[in-house]
Amino acid sequence: MHERYVPADVEAAAQSDWRAADAYRSKEDANRKKFYCVSMLPYPSGKLHMGHVRNYTINDVMYRYLRMNGYNTLMPMGWDAFGMPAENAAMANGVPPAQWTYENIAYMKKQMQSMGLAIDWSREVTTCKPDYYKWNQWLFLKMLEKGVAYKKTGTVNWDPVDQTVLANEQVIDGRGWRSGALVEKREIPMYYMRITQYADELLNDLDGLGWPERVKVMQHNWIGKSFGVNFGFPYELDGEKKLLRVFTTRADTIMGVTFCAIAAEHPLAARLARDKPALQAFIDECKRGGVAEADIATMEKKGVATGFSVSHPLTGEPVEVWIGNYVLMSYGEGAVMGVPAHDERDFAFAKKYGLPIRQVIAVEGETYSTDAWQEWYGDKTRAVCVNSGKYDGLAHDAAVDAIAAELKAGGLGDKQITYRLRDWGISRQRYWGTPIPIIHCPSCGDVPVPEQDLPVVLPEDLVPDGTGNPLAKSDAFLNCTCPKCGAAAKRETDTMDTFVDSAWYFSRYAAPDAQTMVDARTDYWMPMDQYIGGIEHAILHLLYSRFWAKVMRDLGLVAFGEPAKNLLTQGMVLNETFYREDAAGKKTWYNPADVTVSFDDKGRPVGAVLKSDGQPVELGGIEKMSKSKNNGVDPQMLIDHYGADTARLFTMFAAPPEQQLEWSGAGVDGASRFLRRVWAFGFANREALAVRAPFDAAQLAEADKTLRREIHGVLKQADFDYQRLQYNTVVSAAMKMLNAIEGAKGATPAVLRETYGVLLRVLYPVVPHVTFELWKALGYADEFGPLLDAPWPKVDEAALEQAEIELVLQVNGKVRGALKVAKDASREAIEAAAVADEMFAKFAEGRPAKKIIVVPGRLVNVVV
């Protein structure tokens, strides 16, 4: 054992032992409780960031603690390797996405290994490899057979210059990110998955999950189950009588309808735009906008009157039809009723275009005005109908029932349950993804690839150039034979949404070498006992993975219908930001490592200069670490300088796992100093710590009893904190233990050995390298086995018992000292001790005690 703690040497030695023992390979064992903990697999972007370090350390701590407690634990890892960033990097660097991806995986895997993570690498999954995505294709075909997957037209962003489809994030101010061309909306055939078929189950099953309430609410709102009325506004056009159908949850406001708005893609819009160039121009403008719901929600609401009216279904009054850029064809019926008096969006639209505003609900004590929107205008809990004829005086529910009944009687509508959730469109007009296993035959149409011909292998040597899909230009991939008739045919060139890849990877970890999609091992490990990832995945990834599990269950592949029992969403890692702004308002961001900050006398930052030129930079505040703000910390530099254990200790100590973590260089230094103290104590006391003499706890001297009482008391709290995932207070507990052990005067070697061994085991899940090496060097491994599987220390409840307790001594209600009495002292004995105490004599000044108040276990108050 070396005197000085050298992290690089300690960590290399520990990792060498773990590799030699294949320490983290997990096997199924029906006789043991299992614990399957998974971190969301990373995209191989090139390097780990501090968010990765935090996520994987949380997972690792959980794994090690539960393994010490006898669980059969598994922590796997893989790579979410398909996706657009690889294509962008390929275009920038002129290399195939496959090369860029595999090089990044190799580097990031090396970084993970340097962190000492307890990963079973024999289960590694890479989603861009054919042996994985074969099963994406296989399940897609099964879903196609069952009608869960199907084909229909969908709207995409089309770049007319690059001749390619753009993701929503590639459309900037209505233009393509590369070409700058005005983006068009196009309708193209796409494959969808019928997630709406599972909407109610996805909603109801949320109740049984140990997930953060915030995530459950987000999913609940995304699914968006609504109870309302679907009805039509009658109209006649070209000699045909039709209905303009809408859905509303506020049928009680139907008498306040003053206009209807339809989507630019609505069939009625195209018909009404004939011979109306201005109307057609507006439709074209709408189609150039983004297709994302978020874009629609934030953009300026605009509309154009069509000059056409439909009839109000209850009054027969004419209702003007507008085309609105905020109406989505993909939601509801592609049309909405406009009730400006009681819908905030409609109110703003009506004020902008001078449309009538008709109040039809009222709240007692409130006065309606069309001057400005007030929150109560949309209130349905207190509202009653007014200006609504026979419905006047009805509350929301009663009005909806009555109006729905009248619409139904007239054949115009009825009550309906709808969902905000839409079927999952999985077709992507991109190269780097799972090929959709469909063949297009001139005679047979769309033909599924036969199961025996899977996987349809994606060529890995293509380099995208930004003009269309490379697969459509690859004769070797594109041209094939129809499996039905043998004629020349073409392969489908769309690939699957990358959310397909991440929808089930955790099931493949359980059986990575299976010759089927999953096998019995999957039902042993799944569902995950703990899933860990960022809140940004609360909706899409987590919702799709839940849907995928239910589909696999219904196909008889697995026994579970939910992929994760418990979910932890770790907080973001934050850091200071610094910038300079030029005359044009453009900001240049500087990394905190390149800046010197000055502080006031209270430690608050008041200024900063760039180290390279000594000139001032602006303080931008604390924000999430990101490339855009240049405020990241390279984990590899941290590990190289301080060691992985210091990085792990700081990230666990600085904040509870679910809360944001503020980066602190001083905090990292403090973590490093603490580990040096742990090592230094072990080295300085190595001979005493080697003593394995048994002891009778009841016969120990007071110094030993005091140390054991403190250590076992802290151990009890640390064990509780491990169970509730509060790892920051676990580290605090370890620091208290070290302080107690270092400060113990007169403790015997045997008790020092016991208590230091407890400290090492409490710290081990957080800092496995240094504790593993100390455990081995000081002979603990010879007694208990390697720290990997050493049993978790048990609290000695007897050690917590105290012969004496300390009571607060008060004289006339003021604290004057402390009183030590036997734990089982009688009230009379406590009173006698109080009046005999020298502090009582000092403050009583010779006056006798009139009354003595004893609060058992807490205080004694003598009134004079």
Curated annotation (Swiss-Prot):
According to its UniProt entry, the protein's GO biological process terms are: leucyl-tRNA aminoacylation
Reactions it catalyzes: tRNA(Leu) + L-leucine + ATP = L-leucyl-tRNA(Leu) + AMP + diphosphate
Which NCBIfam families does this entry report, sorted A to Z? leuS_bact
Motif range ('KMSKS' region): 624-628
Q: Where in the cell is it found?
A: Cytoplasm
Molecular functions (GO terms) = aminoacyl-tRNA deacylase activity; ATP binding; leucine-tRNA ligase activity
User: Among the entry's GO cellular component annotations, what is one?
Assistant: cytosol
Determine if Signal is one of this entry's keywords: no
Pfam families found in the cross-reference section: Anticodon_1, tRNA-synt_1, tRNA-synt_1_2, tRNA-synt_1g
Per UniProt, ATP binds at K627
The name this protein carries in UniProt is Leucine--tRNA ligase
Q: Which family does it belong to?
A: Belongs to the class-I aminoacyl-tRNA synthetase family.
The source organism is: Burkholderia pseudomallei (strain 668)
Lineage runs:
Bacteria, Pseudomonadati, Pseudomonadota, Betaproteobacteria, Burkholderiales
Instruction: Kindly state which keywords UniProt assigns to this record, in alphabetical order.
Output: Aminoacyl-tRNA synthetase, ATP-binding, Cytoplasm, Ligase, Nucleotide-binding, Protein biosynthesis
Coiled coil stretches, renumbered: none
Renumbered ranges of motif 'HIGH' region: 42-52
Q: Report whether Nucleus shows up as a keyword of the record.
A: no
Enzyme Commission identifier(s):
6.1.1.4
Entry's PANTHER family? LEUCINE--TRNA LIGASE, MITOCHONDRIAL, LEUCYL-TRNA SYNTHETASE
